[in-house]
Design a protein with these regions (language model features):
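Conserved G1/Walker A P-loop phosphate-binding module
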Residues: 1-86
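Short, glycine/charged-enriched secondary-structure capping and boundary segments
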Residues: 22-23, 41-44, 86-89, 124-128, ...
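Structured catalytic cores of enzymes that bind and process phosphorylated ligands/cofactors
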Residues: 26, 33-34, 40, 63, ...
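Conserved C-terminal guanine-recognition region of P-loop GTPase G domains, centered on the G4
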Residues: 71, 93-168
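Nucleotide-state-sensitive switch-loop elements of NTP-binding domains
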Residues: 79-101
Length: 186
């Protein structure tokens, strides 16, 4: 898809009401600092539309990006490590749960996982929770440009396919630094 217009249209915090609209939504979710915002910037061919940081927990709101006035790409706060209190993390979790449970426009959830490491228990738990909620999450393996190709292929077969047993879709390998997306059919 050629992006002709891109706008951060809605930002929802912990107590915000979620927007009602008639466009489809695609959500991007994963552990804190997994590269969600970097991936979005790469997909959009923009350097800093979605704010990025080396500090985990930079995205603290649900951010709705309007693409060509046709759909929304939704950047969700990461789960796991962040330099915030457990209380705030619990509020984020409830905010995301509310979004997943109430958005009638959400069609797909892209679950981002760092390919350099084995998926965490929280990654697997999140994947299973999405299935229980009726979603068929598409896993995107991020940070592929930070490891060698042979290690990357080994990690897919050993770490990813073992941990995501019900997963039979296309695994996307993303290299945001080189702006390349590689497809590896399993």
């Amino acid at each position: 898809m050629t992006i002709k217009s891109l706008e951060l249209e809605t930002v929802c915090g912990i107590t915000s009401k979620l927007p009602q609209h008639d466009k489809i939504e695609m959500a991007f979710w994963g552990r804190s600092n997994v590269g969600k915002s970097s991936l979005l910037n790469t997909l959009w061919n923009r350097k800093s539309m979605a704010r990025i940081s080396s500090q985990p927990g930079k995205t603290q709101t649900i951010n709705y990006y309007n693409i060509n006035d046709l759909c929304y790409m939704v950047d969700l706060p990461g789960y796991g490590y962040a330099k915030i209190s457990k209380e705030i993390q619990a509020k984020w979790a409830r905010m995301i749960e509310r979004y997943l449970d109430t958005s009638n426009a959400l069609r797909v959830v892209f679950l981002l996982v760092d390919i350099r490491h084995e998926p965490t228990a929280k990654d697997v738990e999140t994947y299973q929770m999405l299935f229980k909620k009726g979603f068929n999450p598409l896993i995107i393996a991020t940070k592929a440009d930070k490891i060698k190709k042979n290690v990357r292929n080994k990690n897919i077969s050993k770490k990813f396919l073992t941990n995501f047993k019900t997963y039979d879709k296309v695994m996307e390998l993303c290299q945001t630094r080189t702006r390349r997306t590689l497809t590896n059919k399993q």
